[in-house]
Amino acid sequence: MKTLALLAAATLALPFAAAAQPARGYSAVPATAPTVATMMTRSTPWKCAGDRCVTNRTEGSPLTMCQLAAKELGTLTAFTANGAAFPDEQLAKCNTRAKSA
């Protein structure tokens, strides 16, 4: 019975783990945890949970996608594009478009 409960819990956690850090698509981590479950940037839907928002869309320039996310979420502390983290200088450029608090 205990094994069944653990298996069920692990199965339920899988979608959240996959959403946390997509290998394809984009992931944005704002300085302040998102207060919305979903958001749209232009025509890109994002899902937010925990400390980040993710989308599986791969179209568009990574810098543009980062700037659009920052415009909605505020200053980002991390951004990944197709599994690759933005270097500090790219993140700083992205955050020039961050919404004011």
Where are the model-predicted features located?
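Classic N-terminal secretory signal peptides
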Residues: 1-21
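Post-signal/leader-peptide non-cytosolic segments of secretory proteins
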Residues: 22-99
